[in-house]
A protein has these predicted regions:
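Extracytoplasmic "Venus flytrap"
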Residues: 29-40, 48-67, 189-192, 276
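Extracytoplasmic ligand-binding site segments that recognize negatively charged/polar headgroups
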Residues: 54-70, 81-99, 103-241
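Short amphipathic alpha-helical coupling segments at ligand-binding clamshell hinges
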Residues: 68, 209, 213, 285-297, ...
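A ligand-binding cleft/hinge motif common to bilobed small-molecule-binding domains
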Residues: 115-119, 243-262
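Periplasmic-binding protein-like
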Residues: 137, 151-154, 180-190, 214-220, 225-227, 297-320, ...
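A bilobed periplasmic-binding-protein/Venus flytrap-type ligand-binding module shared by bacterial periplasmic
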Residues: 155-162, 199-203, 274-287, 305-306
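Extracellular/periplasmic bilobal clamshell ligand-binding domains
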Residues: 320-360
Length: 360
């Protein structure tokens, strides 16, 4: 993207770089997968000695990342938590450069789309957290290379001043109405944008029906938005630049709507869903502190931080906030198509081809 350009290049360069870096200095990994009765104490003692942990994440700083940092350090004041925020491709590129330089700074990587790149490039190592046992089995990576931190649901965003309530698209087919020609936008440089939109319908409908739909959708002259995140695209919808945007994080519009912005979300059946994941890069400097942070983020305390930030916690015992309940498909009773990272990796090359054939 530049759908099959920049993102595909990013993925291939990550894979090649990590293959070349496979001979990087070794690291004792037994603490990462240790399950003995004294595991938690070992992690705590080791983290105390290490004294710091660095996370690379896609979390928005003021919304969730800073509150998470403050909550973690309040519980474990002897571990200084530092962070760097970026999109998934940027996180992968940053870790790539660090491994190539044999100077890995990031101890933990987290975000939507990061897991796909991590698994495809073989850049992370197995770990065990007892907190994973409480998470939905369908979201848990059996290899132990990733663990889900939060659930992402994707929806249609619309400007409430430009789209009358009785004209809001209720289905994917409604997007084919001539009134929306040239007024639909989507993100082309993010795995959770255009490729996930295409993959979702290919999986749900089958290739034949999906391709027939995509050909019709191409006639709608969908606007390729390629210069920002999902949050940025929602801001453009709020500003009236685009009446509609497909496959944005469902919580962004409703949070803005609660603050008085002219925007809202509409869940379309099936709702594409992915899990933001957390992992430990190979050769991480602070493995004990990395485990301590992961334990915290997956615990009810850490999951509560996600909930307060308007995100959807992966832990089934932690409810999302009332602000975003309206776009929780499990509450709204809208069918969900949860797509694991390995399935996204399998389907994305063809989805890239479809984009280039029909929409570029």
């Amino acid at each position: 993207m530049k759908f099959a350009g920049s993102r595909a290049l990013c993925l291939s360069s990550v894979v090649l770089s990590f293959a070349a870096a496979g001979t990087c200095h070794g690291q004792a990994t037994n603490i990462l997968t240790y399950k003995g009765a004294d595991r938690d104490q070992r992690v705590l003692d080791g983290a105390r000695k290490e004294g710091q942990v660095v996370i690379y994440t896609g979390l928005v700083v003021n919304v969730a990342l800073r509150p998470m940092t403050e909550a973690f350090m309040a519980k474990y004041p002897f571990v200084k938590m530092s962070y760097w925020r970026g999109e998934s491709e940027a996180i992968a590129s940053k870790i790539t450069a660090e491994i190539r330089a044999n100077n890995v700074v990031g101890d933990v990587i987290e975000g939507t789309g990061v897991g796909e790149l991590a698994l495809a490039a073989d850049i992370v190592q197995p770990f065990y957290s007892p907190m994973v046992e409480a998470l939905p089995k369908a979201m848990v990576d059996p290899s132990g290379l990733t663990a889900p931190t939060r659930v992402s649901y994707f929806a249609l965003a619309y400007n409430t001043k430009l789209v009358p309530a009785d004209k809001v698209p209720q289905t994917y087919e409604d997007l084919l109405d001539p009134m929306w020609k040239g007024k639909i936008s989507w993100r082309i440089e993010s795995a959770s944008g255009t490729p996930l939109f295409l993959t979702n319908l290919r999986l749900a409908w089958g290739e034949e029906r999906a391709m027939d739909y995509f050909k019709k959708l191409a006639g709608q002259k969908v606007v390729n938005f390629g210069s920002g995140s999902a949050r940025t695209l929602v801001d453009r919808v709020m500003a009236g630049e685009y009446p509609l945007a497909v496959n944005v994080f469902a919580h962004f519009p409703v949070i803005s709507a609660a603050q008085g912005a002219p925007v809202n979300s509409k869940l379309l059946d099936p709702v594409p869903s992915t899990g933001a994941t957390i992992s430990i890069p190979k050769n991480a400097r602070h493995p004990h502190a990395a485990l301590l942070l992961i334990d915290f983020m997956l615990s009810p305390d850490g999951q509560g931080v996600f909930s307060k930030a308007g995100l959807f916690p992966a832990h089934p015992g932690v409810r999302p906030s009332d602000v975003v309940a309206s776009v929780d498909p499990t509450i709204a009773k809208v069918p969900v198509n949860f797509i694991p990272s390995d399935v996204i990796n399998k389907y994305e090359p063809r989805s890239d081809e479809i984009y280039n054939e029909l929409f570029r």
